[in-house]
């Protein structure tokens, strides 16, 4: 069925204007993004087909460019548009979280870090600088690559924490493999950093490893 054959109340764009975005299904929202269908398949049917093929929005949105463009009705232009929309959404959420963030529980930190590190293909080491009330001053990626004593420099971490007037810090890094278990190298570098920061009266509250949708807290495991 052609989209133009549907009453206005069933056309995604008109439905959104009338009822708001929350009233639309996943397929209808995706159809607005896609804009056009294919011969013999209107845009809503195409959107539903893509959702069925990918099983979840997460799978569709996190597909590589090659995987994305290989799918029916998609191409480089759509991939670029989607990545731009996702990045804008993430920056908006980061802005909201950063403005309101008070890290008084591991779960609050998990939510923030999962948003920050979702989809990263490279291992990174991030520091959250906190004030005396555990409010976020700033987050910063200090190091890239495998986290060990050769790639994470305590002197640089201390320097950055002092520069940001931090009363406390939380370390975080990701495991792109999706396995969040801490390695022996993770434990050793955390201990070195904790000792270095103690010399300037800055508390290390936690070190959190993000692996996919899972997080592991050193503090909860008694490692800090």
From Swiss-Prot:
Instruction: Give all cystine bridges in this chain.
Output: none
> Recorded GO terms, molecular function?
metal ion binding; metallopeptidase activity
**Sequence motif: JAMM motif, positions:** 173-186
Check the record and name the Pfam families matching this protein: RadC, UPF0758_N
Q: Please give the Gene3D superfamilies that the UniProt record associates with this protein.
A: Cytidine Deaminase, domain 2
Q: Name one GO biological process term.
A: proteolysis
NADP recorded as keyword: no
Q: Which UniProt keywords apply?
A: Hydrolase, Metal-binding, Metalloprotease, Protease, Zinc
- Write out the residues that bind Zn(2+): 173, 175, 186
Query: Which residue ranges does the record assign to the MPN domain?
Result: 102-224
- Family, similarity comment: Belongs to the UPF0758 family.
What is the protein's given name?
UPF0758 protein PSHAa2643
